[in-house]
Amino acid sequence: MAVDPFDSALDLLRRLNPKQTTDHLNAIISIAPDLTEDLLSSVDQPLTVRRCKQTGRDYLLCDYNRDGDSYRSPWSNQFDPPLDEAGSGGVGAGGNEGAGEGAIPSERVRKMEVKANEAFDVYRDLYYEGGVSSVYFWNLDDGFAGVVLLKKSSPQGGNSEGVWDSIHVFEAIERGRSTHYKLTSTVILTLSTSGGNLGEMDLSGNMTRQVEQDLPVENDDSHIANVGRLVEDMELKMRNLLQEVYFGKAKDVVGDLRSIGSLSEGARDREAQRELIGSMRK
């Protein structure tokens, strides 16, 4: 039975350091260029920041606002570098539907996209106290879809560095006075620290979770509130899961493998503990 090259590429990426996902992905694409589009649309990469030439505001790049080497700014709705021709209403010049490939949202969906960017800009400032956020919407036959991007990097130059990238892709299927939302959220986290006593440590990884929910809708503004609530709840759950489960387990493993103090100090502490327990038993 023949092995699917696409599945093999994904399997390989899962086994490599997630901190270098972009480098590994580019290496695989150079070997198998026919997998380029499938891999770029399937593999979550750390987000890249670009400045909008029309507005001077930063925005985030991803596959959902990409057409070749051009990316659409959510602030100006323009591609950089400019495209020869771009479609409207979620349909690109080549007749494609959805995000990317020259597609821009319809007038109604674009208005929601603008409001969503304003709302998540406030959310980013409240929860992240900095960083960059971007929201992109596109049309579907029975509703619309979008992606909410958030990126925060710790200041460089200290003993510790960290980067948080969250990617929230959703579909909103409209059903009269209610809408069915399907949200897929991915967090890509990189943490590194170095010091005289501890040396260097690097923790990198990603986590993906999904949720589906039906919520009431009165008007287009309700969509912004509903998506905001879903993203906020999901980020809180994933952050708590990372902190309590994954980091807690990593702390236990590192503690078992490596002591902050010297081995002789650890041996003396264990001997003192044994003597104390022995005296209590007498």
UniProtKB/Swiss-Prot annotation:
<keyword id="KW-0963">Cytoplasm</keyword>
<dbReference type="InterPro" id="IPR001698">
    <property type="entry name" value="CAPZB"/>
</dbReference>
<keyword id="KW-0117">Actin capping</keyword>
<dbReference type="InterPro" id="IPR037282">
    <property type="entry name" value="CapZ_alpha/beta"/>
</dbReference>
<comment type="subunit">
    <text>Component of the F-actin capping complex, composed of a heterodimer of an alpha and a beta subunit.</text>
</comment>
<dbReference type="GO" id="GO:0030479">
    <property type="term" value="C:actin cortical patch"/>
</dbReference>
<keyword id="KW-0009">Actin-binding</keyword>
<feature type="region of interest" description="Disordered">
    <location>
        <begin position="73"/>
        <end position="103"/>
    </location>
</feature>
<dbReference type="InterPro" id="IPR042276">
    <property type="entry name" value="CapZ_alpha/beta_2"/>
</dbReference>
<comment type="similarity">
    <text>Belongs to the F-actin-capping protein beta subunit family.</text>
</comment>
<dbReference type="Pfam" id="PF01115">
    <property type="entry name" value="F_actin_cap_B"/>
</dbReference>
<comment type="function">
    <text>F-actin-capping proteins bind in a Ca(2+)-independent manner to the fast growing ends of actin filaments (barbed end) thereby blocking the exchange of subunits at these ends. Unlike other capping proteins (such as gelsolin and severin), these proteins do not sever actin filaments.</text>
</comment>
<dbReference type="GO" id="GO:0030036">
    <property type="term" value="P:actin cytoskeleton organization"/>
</dbReference>
<dbReference type="InterPro" id="IPR019771">
    <property type="entry name" value="F-actin_capping_bsu_CS"/>
</dbReference>
<dbReference type="GO" id="GO:0051016">
    <property type="term" value="P:barbed-end actin filament capping"/>
</dbReference>
<protein>
    <recommendedName>
        <fullName>F-actin-capping protein subunit beta</fullName>
    </recommendedName>
</protein>
<dbReference type="GO" id="GO:0051015">
    <property type="term" value="F:actin filament binding"/>
</dbReference>
<dbReference type="InterPro" id="IPR043175">
    <property type="entry name" value="CAPZB_N"/>
</dbReference>
<dbReference type="GO" id="GO:0008290">
    <property type="term" value="C:F-actin capping protein complex"/>
</dbReference>
<keyword id="KW-0206">Cytoskeleton</keyword>
<feature type="compositionally biased region" description="Gly residues">
    <location>
        <begin position="87"/>
        <end position="101"/>
    </location>
</feature>
<dbReference type="GO" id="GO:0000902">
    <property type="term" value="P:cell morphogenesis"/>
</dbReference>
